[in-house]
Amino acid sequence: MSELNQGCCAGHADGAGEAAEHGCCSHEAAGAAGAGAAKPAFVADGVNVAVVGATGQVGRVMCAMLDQRDFPVKSLRLFSSVRSAGSVVTWRGQDITVEDVAKADLSGIDVAIFSAGATASREYAPKFAAAGAVVVDNSSAWRMDPTKKLVIPEINADVLTAEDKIIANPNCSTIQMLVALAPLRKFGIKRIVVSTYQSITGTGVKAVKQLENCLIY
């Protein structure tokens, strides 16, 4: 269950670090709304959204992106392990209490964004799907599962159907590379040589703290 709060980059939601406790999504989205009147937190004709792993690094960024991209949210529910359950996250000026994913009623959710690590995704994603939600999973749990579709929206979103209840999100390096390479397929690609530099956050919050001890001041 500790994976529910582990921090990592969006393509590596399997981080082995400790939880970023009591995170606030609104901190990540500071200034995104710009000047003028505040946008409404929720819209009547929007989508009922859940973020699983909401107090971790990736979960907080997911909350921020929902705000920054003006996603039409009808309701927002935040889930974590029992360790962070009960904490309060502020999103668009609204205080939202984080729920214990192991005990919560999962009904009424349209889309569930999982940023909780592979173990948590394997355990809880099917339960969210069975309750009626479409799950978008950031971990490696379903990437190699032949029954699940691995989707990069800019490339192959058209493969999705109403029957797809758990959608796998590729590794972050894969996404960046294929968005650039997809238009070149028509020319015929024989071989690709790739060098990547991975973020330390892919290992988790603990690794970030360890790196700080190695920096020269």
Which stretches of residues belong to each language-model region?
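N-terminal Rossmann-like NAD(P) cofactor-binding subdomain of oxidoreductases
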Residues: 2-12, 22-217
